[in-house]
């Protein structure tokens, strides 16, 4: 049913796109649509004043269970760039990519080229999902400052490749933000390495990368 619904939504999006007026060139800035908040934050920090960056999945909405509306797909199609983290997180992205014209909107996968850890099944920690969430690969990369840097670098490099005339701005912005993430990484390393207790308990097994990078042990309940 989801597939049929998305086909209907895609057709509606085409109609909305045909009727709407794109704002891509009104202020001379790029229009970038991002999926959920970490991707939005990283992209906004890199793009700076060169782009209008839009957040698709609003705060309080479960990313896994989110389904794009016709208007959402139209927003993606009308954008210059669409940025997402990983299809194991935004499970709906593949169907969206099939429904849009990727010759007109650049798609950036922030985890491109990264080696991901095996995923896990979660059956009890999301009451709104009957079957829980199952990830072939763990997508929660951004929760480790050390790996968040790689996401920022991928977004930076992808934007530079597409818009080389804005290279200096993207690289300068990214460097400033990476410096902050480096400082956070150092603080995590120094503080957590001194911790006597290395185990922590969590209901949502999303911290495997953080645990691996800082010598901790995640225990799921």
Indicate residue ranges for each PLM-predicted region.
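Sec-dependent signal peptide recognition
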Residues: 2-10
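Extracytoplasmic metal-acquisition and chelation regions
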Residues: 5, 15, 19-221
